Amino acid sequence: MEVAVKRKHVIEIVTYLMVFLAMWVISPWVGKLLDRLYYPSPRLFSDSFVIFLVSGMVGFLGLGLTMWTIVVFKTIGKGTPNPKVPPIELVISGPYKYSRNPMAVGGFLFLLGESGVYQSPSLAGLAVLFAVILYLNTVHIEEPQLKKRFGQSYERYCETVPRFLPTLFQRDEG
């Protein structure tokens, strides 16, 4: 039993380390590398403090949303975002009350903000590619697996909560 617990902790630590590296190191590095290869003048906007500030706010909003989802996965779902150690409980509170995939929304917002901060057209393109891949993964892999694992509870959840972007007026469950 202790080996399984240690394995779970190692997977959890590696997951968080990979998320950190992907967000703060790998994505800007890949964006800048692609900019150097394909764009002679890789500036999205003219130098503007307002663009920098707004982009930074969008990025930190995405980071905050991503961190919130990880905390909710750990505390309420008793698991991690890693499919090797998934939540045991269906998580439908916190940010999941408004979006079935707030972690994806947070990751997209972070990349989008990062692309503005670094003024990287390639990073903006990677953000869009990230969104497309997450959409396909969600529809074709995640949702069928969650329907199998959680059955009618998940189906009811899908009926009341939008897949990605929250609506201004949530449907009333009662």
Name what the model sees in each region.
Residues 1-93, 105-145, 149-174:
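Membrane-anchoring alpha-helices and their flanking helix-loop junctions
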Residues 101:
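Extended, alpha-helix-rich binding/interface surfaces that flank or overlap catalytic cores
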Residues 96:
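Solvent-exposed interhelical
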